[in-house]
Structure formats: structure tokens, C-alpha cells
Amino acid sequence: STPPPSSAVSGSPEPGESPAPAGPIAIAGASDFDPETDGGNDEENPDAVAKAIDGDPATYWETLRYKNRPNLGGLKPGVGVVLDLGEKRTVTAVELMLSADNPEDPTSVEIRVPEGSKPSTRTEADWTVVGANDAAKGTVTIELDTPTETPYLLVYFTKLPPTENGYKARLHEVTVDAIPDAELVVE
């Protein structure tokens, strides 16, 4: 019998060719994430959030300053930035350029994807952790546990480095790596 014709997406590599590696993609937009349900006030420096995706490492978005403890003062599980990728993309890694008053002080950060097709702003529980770094400092790459198709990502800070009179994290730039669409094979 004759094998069925291949149903690979046009532009897929021929047998024996290596697929193109994942690479940086454009980020369509960003918004702050501080749900009231989680103890927040629905606002975490929203006016500065675009600086995390503006391509200028000298600018940044930062969390508010939290007192007493690095885990956001014990007030909430975390805060972060929601990234709009413009469409579903198969994400493999997220690179973060972070800074702290002391460059040796680490930040705990997670990469999450929404449970549904829309980015929830109601609670962090509506997002699934797909990668994390509990000792992030400087420029770090967080590889996702498995390549994940999603139109949105949440960069979620759960423990902040010390600053004067408290704790605060700064996010200078975010780069998202994804597999080129032409490399996806439809079975």
C-alpha cells in the first residue's frame, strides 16, 4: 500500500535538514499584574511597564517597594508583567535583564502561561508556571520546561532583592524566544 502524503506545513524543512532554531520574537504589548484578589491593588507601576519591552536597557519597570520581607512583605504571592505576543507562539525561553541595588542580590521569578486563551488579571492561580529561577540576577535566560504555545506570558516576581528601606525588583528588558511558525508540523 502507498503511504499517505505528508501533511507538513509549507516551509517545513526537507528530511535531513535541520529546523531553524528558536529565536527572538516581537512583543506586541505589556501590562502590570497585581490582582486585588491576591492582596494587590490592581496596579504595579503601570506607567513604566512599557519600558521592559522598549529595547533600551537603560530604562526599566520596577515593582513597588515592599517592607519587612523579600516575599513582597508577606502581603501577596507576587507581582509582575503580562506580555502580549500578538498571537499564539511556541515559546521556548524568556531572557530577562534584571538589576538590584547590589548586583549580587538575587530575585525569584517565574514564567507563567494563562489557563485559558485570555490573560487573567483576577488571580495568579489562573496562570501555570512553565519555568522559574529562584536566584536570578543580571541577565538570565529561563528555559521553559517544554516548548509552550501561548499568546501571553506572565513574568511573575515572588521574592525581591533588598533596596533602601525594603525590597524591590527592576526589569530592564524582556526577550522571548519562540520556534518559527514555519517549523511547526501538522500531523
Give residue ranges: language-model regions.
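Extracellular carbohydrate recognition and processing domains
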Residues: 122-146
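Disordered, acidic Ser/Thr/Pro-rich linker "stalks" and the adjacent N-terminal cap
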Residues: 2-86, 102-103, 182-187
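Aromatic, loop-rich ligand-recognition surfaces of beta-strand-rich domains
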Residues: 58-122, 144-187
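Generic hydrophobic, helix-prone segments enriched in Leu/Val/Ile
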Residues: 25-30, 61, 109, 129-131, ...
